[in-house]
Amino acid sequence: VKGRRSRVIHSAMNQNSYQQSLDYLYGLEKFGMIFGLTKVEAILEAIGNPHREIQAIHIGGTNGKGSTAAMMASILQKEGYRVGLYTSPHLTRFTERIKVNGKEVEKEEVATLTEWMKKRIEAAGITPPFTFFDFTTAMALLYFKQRMVDLSILEVGLGGRLDSTNVVDPLLSIITNITRDHEEQLGKSILKIAGEKAGIIKKAVSYTHLRAHETGR
């Protein structure tokens, strides 16, 4: 009975810590969208620059980038690679955003990572505003380093050039179909939008553009 009670108390404490972490993370949404890499780079510096120690595939575009990321992760996993996958937004649970070999990050791990990162960020003198996506991107990269993934697949949140995920120096950049979206942030023309999304293409890095096939009616 004592053992069972202890497990129940421990589970409740973990759930409370996880909820506190979510409250902190979602509280960052009050800062809205802040484009640029300055804050996420500062956060990564404070936590040891984990992105420099993992191999990444970076996927941007307008349509299909999430499904492309998921398919690539599945294929690579079947080939024997240990694969980290970072996508957004989530459908029902925050933990859907960060996976290793198809398994979502545990709630307890989210709580532990959040608290550890907060302490390191505060010690480094980094103060808000930084965004929910800045923090969660850094969290995903740290988690992938800790779990010693062979490859990490990162889906761009919005745009590309100034997106928080663009801190990585990837093995491969992929851009899916490009159409008009988020014109207030990315530009009013398809050319400007494409230019922002193409910002994930790095010098001396392989890239590919996946175009949707048009069918006649």
Where are these regions (language model features)?
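ATP-dependent carboxylate-amine ligase catalytic core
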Residues: 37, 41-52, 78-168, 180, ...
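Phosphate-coordinating loops and pocket residues in cytosolic domains that bind phosphorylated ligands
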Residues: 27, 187, 195
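Single conserved hydrophobic/aromatic residue that forms the stacking wall/gate
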Residues: 209-217
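Short, basic, low-complexity termini and linkers enriched in Ser/Thr/Gly/Pro
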Residues: 1-12
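Conserved beta-strand/loop subsegment of P-loop NTPase cores
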Residues: 174-175
